[in-house]
C-alpha cells in the first residue's frame, strides 16, 4: 500500500516536472524567436535549432529545482559551437556571455536547493568577475 502511494506521488511529480519543462521550452523558443542569434558570437539560429541553442546555466539533470526556471538559460548556438563551450566552467567563465549568466543567476540563485560543486565553482568564478 505504501509503495503504491509512493509510486503514484512519484508519477504525479514526474508529470508536473514534464509540464514545467514543456512550458520552459516554449518560453525559451519565444525568446529566441524574437532575436534568433547566438548571444556569444552573433551567428543566426534557425528555428529547427532553437531547442539545441537553449543552454541551461545550471544543468537541468543536476539542478532539478531550477531546471524550468525562466532565467536559467542563455541562447548559445549549437552549430557555431558556443553551446558546447558552456559545458565546462573553466571555458564558460571566459566567454563574453558569462556576465549575462551571472546576472541571470542573481534572479533565481536562492531557489537552488541542490548541493553540488558546480554551484560553488560558479560562485567562485562569478566572484572573480564581479570584484
Report residues per predicted region.
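Short, charged surface segments at domain edges that flank catalytic/cofactor-binding sites
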Residues: 1-37, 64-67
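Short, charged/polar surface micro-motifs in flexible loops or helix N-caps
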Residues: 46, 60, 82-83
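Short Cys/His-rich "knuckle" micro-motifs
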Residues: 48-57, 86-94
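Aromatic- and Lys/Arg-enriched surface recognition patch
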Residues: 70, 90-95, 100-109
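Short Cys/His-centered divalent metal-binding micro-motifs
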Residues: 73-97
